[in-house]
Amino acid sequence: MDKLPCNELNQVRKAPHAAIGPVLIEALPYIRKFEGKTFVIKYGGAAMKDACLKNSFAQNVTLLRKVGIRIVLVHGGGDAITKTAEKLGITSRFLHGRRVTDKEMISVIQMTLAGKVNQDIVQLISEHGGKAVGVTGLDADTIKALPHPNAETLGLVGEVEQINTAYIDLLCRAGLIPVIAPIGFDDKGNVYNINADDAASSIAIALKAEKLIYVSDVEGIHVGERILKTICKTEAADFIEQGIISGGMIPKVLSAFKTLDSGVGKIHLIDGKATHSLLLEIFTHEGVGTQFIAEQDSDQSQNR
């Protein structure tokens, strides 16, 4: 057996066989339940930077596809864009959390996301036995975009107008994992920088996905020291009113429920800094993050 590339990944080998077996068996009903379903995964944050976490994520995605789950991966890459711009002597500017994007910057974004970040992800998945294909929003009209309402100040920042679901579905039916860089275009040929969270949400809605999973740098929704396993719309409204959910988490929560209202089955927020968090969230009863559900009932709250 080849040595695993990370000490963290080797810890599982130290556990008694009797402890590992039940964890594997616990996954069985979820594998049956989700076979043939579509999961859209937004990949970003620390999980894209650390070599061990990148390996873990690629393994997780490959395993999900191998057990029959259709995976559509949408990635970010903000730090990589900033570093590339710096090397080229271009200063990055941000307004309300959005990257100000002129023609020079959109070229950097295309070069970095499509030419480097996207292909690195595809290669890593392939190394673990998966079949991934790199896609940008420009390919086969995958993402048609409109200018952002604040285009006068943000420049070539866009919002999703339309998703080519037929093309994505074609790739999934061929057994491939589409790895999508969030770049879009309009009828005039303008290319737009699109927020990866927004792109993932739009793709999940268009595909009527079973799940939209955000792999991020937060463990989930915190209430005090506790991470909520499940949250419904009513609870979220109460927590926002009480100030328990505040700051930058408010738009994320509201966006999650808007996506749910548009037909996506469940939304999950998980910590990409935790090894194998994706598998643990999907294939165990407890999960490791927070799942957003449309209605609170015993069946939904106890199942991933």
Curated annotation (Swiss-Prot):
Reaction(s) this enzyme catalyzes, per UniProt: N-acetyl-L-glutamate + ATP = N-acetyl-L-glutamyl 5-phosphate + ADP
Pathway where this protein functions: Amino-acid biosynthesis; L-arginine biosynthesis; N(2)-acetyl-L-ornithine from L-glutamate: step 2/4
CDD domains: AAK_NAGK-C (cd04250)
GO terms classed as biological process: arginine biosynthetic process via ornithine; L-arginine biosynthetic process
Role played: Catalyzes the ATP-dependent phosphorylation of N-acetyl-L-glutamate.
Identification of the protein by name: Acetylglutamate kinase
Family to which the UniProt record says this protein belongs: Belongs to the acetylglutamate kinase family. ArgB subfamily.
InterPro entries per the UniProt record, alphabetical: AceGlu_kinase-like_sf (IPR036393), AcgluKinase_fam (IPR004662), ArgB (IPR037528), Asp/Glu/Uridylate_kinase (IPR001048), Glu/AcGlu_kinase (IPR001057), NAGK-C (IPR041727)
Record site: Transition state stabilizer: 42, 252
Keywords carried by this UniProt record: Amino-acid biosynthesis, Arginine biosynthesis, ATP-binding, Cytoplasm, Kinase, Nucleotide-binding, Transferase
EC number: 2.7.2.8
GO molecular function: acetylglutamate kinase activity; ATP binding
Lineage: Bacteria, Pseudomonadati, Chlorobiota, Chlorobiia, Chlorobiales
Record-level GO cellular component terms: cytoplasm
Record has Hydrolase as a keyword: no
Binding locations of substrate: 77-78, 99, 193
Predominant place of localization: cytoplasm
UniProt subcellular location: Cytoplasm
SUPFAM superfamilies, per database record: Carbamate kinase-like
A Pfam family the protein falls into: AA_kinase
Cited NCBIfam families: argB
